[in-house]
Amino acid sequence: MSSAPAAGTASTSRFFKSHVSETDPDIFSAIQKEFGRQQHEIELIASENIVSQAVLDAAGSVLTNKYAEGYPGKRYYGGCQYVDIVEDIAIDRAKKLFNCEFANVQPNSGSQANQGVFNALAQPGDTILGLSLAAGGHLTHGAPVNQSGKWFKAVHYMVKPDSHLIDMDEVRKLAQEHKPRIIIAGGSAYPRKIDFAAFRAIADEVGAIFLVDMAHFAGLVAAGLIPSPFPHAHVVTTTTHKTLRGPRGGMILTNDADIAKKINSAIFPGIQGGPLMHVIAGKAVAFGEALRPDFKVYIKQVMDNARALGEVLVQNGFALVSGGTDTHLVLVDLRPKKLTGTKAEKALGRANITCNKNGIPFDPEKPMVTSGIRLGSPAGTTRGFGVAEFQEIGRLISEVLDGVAKNGEDGNGAVEAAVKAKAIALCDRFPIYA
């Protein structure tokens, strides 16, 4: 006599076999629409990129099911033998990629990586010295609205008014005056190389820890196409997306064993619990991709494309902060066209070109208005755009923004429609996840 199926067998089978398209059409619809947006819009947000199918596979794997508080070999849960393998691989690849001795791959974001460093190496009320947000710095470097600006006494250096390069004389003066616990180099909208040796010399003069936040340019460092923060930095933080082309997350690197020990404790149990093992797997895959020779070819193209884009914009009457770029991004000063960043971002969005409004040094406009836009080449380069395509993108941007300059905020509808069609056609020539 055959036994009846166990209660719940059918529903259990559906649970493990049904895709989101079947179980949650609202979410599936939003995902599909976002895929369509990414497929048919020119992505110029400098902090965004497009991951490989392999990274997507790892980040969407069964590793999401596993809790793994602690570190490889020292977990607070059983059954971690395979996620230990994943995290060890991620750590080893990160150390090889950046030629350093220690790596913590658990931070869930660049912000949490920075918070972890502060938690490890400073006390509330200590002074930190970083690049002003108004000059291209980052919120987590002591902006008043950020936790870093609430917990610490934040002092900020600027760029020079004429060149828009970091004013190292001011850095030294402020360091000597305020004796910061931590000096920070790096930012979110600074398009030039940074003199890490000069920063370290100042840090040594005042007994400060030197932190480099290379979230934006980590891929360029990994490829060996701009100078590495090591051996100058005591500690380095980064995101794992942006130019590294991995999943969204953070990482902390150092060559100092004592700092590494403090960092590990600061991340867990200090500010995080169980790490996101599926994301760490995605990081490991991305690091492996970045260790291949073709990654250097990719990053060189990223840099060439950013320069080409900037040159076309200058030819069409725009100004570039610092006069150009050494990296993956250009910061465009819109004042020669009498435009604001808000108007430019909206108009370009209508034409299927995605970017973000951004303040420029000594910006007369409010932070939610701005006098600039920030443009980056990583995502477009990932999908295959070369110099010719970025030159065309520069011309398309110019056409749209000239329409806004002439006609006001609503722009030139006919021009925007024509540019949108060209943007879609360009993207169709270089499809993603085809």
Curated annotation (Swiss-Prot):
(6S)-5,6,7,8-tetrahydrofolate binds at L133, G137, H138, L139. Its main location: cytoplasm. InterPro entries: PyrdxlP-dep_Trfase (IPR015424), PyrdxlP-dep_Trfase_major (IPR015421), PyrdxlP-dep_Trfase_small (IPR015422), Ser_HO-MeTrfase (IPR001085), Ser_HO-MeTrfase-like (IPR049943), Ser_HO-MeTrfase_PLP_BS (IPR019798), SHMT-like_dom (IPR039429). Keywords: Amino-acid biosynthesis, Cytoplasm, One-carbon metabolism, Pyridoxal phosphate, Transferase. The modification N6-(pyridoxal phosphate)lysine is found at K242. It is found in: Cytoplasm. Its cofactor is pyridoxal 5'-phosphate. It catalyses: (6R)-5,10-methylene-5,6,7,8-tetrahydrofolate + glycine + H2O = (6S)-5,6,7,8-tetrahydrofolate + L-serine. CDD domains: SHMT. PANTHER family: SERINE HYDROXYMETHYLTRANSFERASE (PTHR11680), SERINE HYDROXYMETHYLTRANSFERASE 1 (PTHR11680:SF35). Belongs to the SHMT family. This is Serine hydroxymethyltransferase. The lineage of its organism: Bacteria, Pseudomonadati, Pseudomonadota, Alphaproteobacteria, Hyphomicrobiales.
